[in-house]
């Protein structure tokens, strides 16, 4: 069910943005540790007037980062690249599955069992394709 109230839509959108950068939030926590250390250092040097502007700048920077990371297309591109890297190669399971599919389809078209020569030809062709694709293919980038 889609929300009808505007404030629900706004909150849901921001929660989706935050969820989109949840991996980056760990980096933000490290930044917060850095700000804490820097605020103590600034206080020790008598520059505590710079602490609140520093914290404010970090908060604004985090919101801007969340917005541009999700709405600017970075999040989508990261997920596309991850998908390309994780699915861009042939696995032994795919080799076995493809060989079984090829045998089944060819036997079905033929209407009878395959001969040993036909099985070897299918296996040889799939082995060649597997060797070509097991390390992945080069995915073209839109530049």
From Swiss-Prot:
TM spans (from-to): 20-42, 52-74
Q: What is its main location?
A: host cell
Question: Where is this protein found?
Answer: Host membrane
Print the keywords alphabetically.
Host membrane, Membrane, Transmembrane, Transmembrane helix
Listed under GO cellular component are: host cell membrane; membrane
The organism named in the record is His1 virus (isolate Australia/Victoria) (His1V)
Q: What is this protein called?
A: Putative transmembrane protein ORF32
- Name the membrane topology term: Multi-pass membrane protein
Query: Carries keyword ATP-binding?
Result: no
